[in-house]
Swiss-Prot record:
Alphabetized UniProt keyword annotations: Membrane, Phosphoprotein, Protein transport, Transmembrane, Transmembrane helix, Transport
Membrane-topology annotation of the record: Multi-pass membrane protein
Coarse class of the protein's main subcellular location: membrane
Pfam families registered for this protein in UniProt: Got1 (PF04178)
GO terms (BP aspect): protein transport; vesicle-mediated transport
Superkingdom classification of source: Eukaryota
Protein's name in the database: Vesicle transport protein SFT2A
Membrane-spanning residues: 37-57, 63-83, 98-118, 123-143
Cellular component annotations (GO), alphabetically ordered: cytoplasm; endomembrane system; intracellular membrane-bounded organelle; membrane
Family: Belongs to the SFT2 family.
Regions of this protein lying in the Lumenal compartment: 58-62, 119-122
Length: 159
């Protein structure tokens, strides 16, 4: 359990300086952070599934877009409980995942704009699909060589 705790907090086997320890310190215990991660993640999945179910109701495109986006935001925010918000933001905007992060955040915004203000149902669905793809690409950036494997797989299917 201790090794899992060190890996999730980013303290593999290195000693941190006092400033880094103060900035990364969390007032929540590891068990509390793990519980809130699970709660937030489950809520995110629930909202996404609820939004998908609402898609089939008359006029449900707007509700689908809102709940699907809220679900994805909650699932993304759940990792803040594991790493801490500052460390999560630093990792999100590292060079390897900067483009994926920007596209993902723009898809969140454009999905809500298309559904709530522009009233363009097709555009809202398109942005939800792009949201799913960008979140997948963002998530793959945390797995070593996963993006390369997906690119090779897709290129071999297309050629």
């Amino acid at each position: 359990m201790e090794k899992l705790r060190r890996v999730l907090s980013g303290q593999d086997d290195e000693e941190q300086g006092l400033t880094a320890q103060v900035l990364d310190a969390s007032s929540l215990s590891f068990n509390t952070r793990l519980k809130w991660f699970a709660i937030c993640f489950v809520c995110g999945v629930f909202f996404s599934i609820l939004g998908t179910g609402l898609l089939w109701l008359p006029g449900g495109i707007k509700l689908f877009a809102v709940f699907y986006t809220l679900g994805n935001l909650a699932a993304l925010a759940s990792t803040c409980f594991l790493m801490g918000p500052v460390k999560q933001l630093k990792k999100m905007f590292e060079a390897t995942r900067l483009l994926a992060t920007i596209v993902m955040l723009l898809c969140f915004i454009f999905t809500l704009c298309a559904a709530l203000w522009w009233h363009k149902k097709g555009l809202a669905v398109l942005f939800c699909i792009l949201q799913f793809l960008s979140m997948t690409w963002y998530s793959l950036s945390y797995i070593p060589y996963a993006r390369d494997a997906v690119i090779k797989c897709c290129s071999s299917l297309l050629s």
